[in-house]
Amino acid sequence: EKYLDILESEGVKATFFVIGQQINGEEQTIKREISQGHEIGVHTYCHEADRIYCNCDTYYKDVIKVKNILKKQFDYDAGLVRFPWGSANTYISSYRDNIIQRFKNIGLEYADWNVSAEDSVGNPTQTSIMQNIRKDYVRYDEPVILMHDSGANKMTLSVLNNIILELKEKGYGFDVLSKRSKCCHFYEN
């Protein structure tokens, strides 16, 4: 909720990729995200590489499970998916084109990022998160910043407002990913 408070106070829209196993208990947060005009995308149901990425059908079913939960519980039709570890990850190399096409067939576009806060790796600090974002965002007209809002990523919350203010000062705008002129992809088929 604190993330949403900051986004609301700064007039910023964001895209949240949800993990299905974490939806239970976060229903009010997801409802608030939707009501405030944020976008909800599918990340995965369980976020365990060996389970979800063992083959194309297993991963497809994992994503569809979350898409169906969002539709049933929130009447929300998710149109984006973010592959855990990105679309160029080695787990899906044998079926990457197939899964991307299957997602497209049901109206799911995939999204990656071009700037990472690296806030889910090791023991991030406020300084390291800011440095990771600063070193890359200037390279893009439309930076897509990957940040995490769950788990042990409390440092991200502590710098979110500073990141927004700095980017606004540099002339950057904010919106949901589906409104970008072009999706950010690591892999193009």
Annotate each predicted stretch with a short phrase.
Residues 1-77, 83, 166, 173, ...:
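Active-site beta->alpha N-cap acidic-glycine motif
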Residues 42-44, 80-84, 111-116, 144-148:
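Short beta-strands and strand-loop turn motifs
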Residues 20, 87, 150-151:
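Residue-level signal for short, function-critical loop segments
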Residues 48-74, 87-142, 155-158:
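Alpha-helical scaffold elements lining the catalytic groove of polysaccharide deacetylases
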Residues 4-15, 72, 139-189:
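Terminal accessory/targeting
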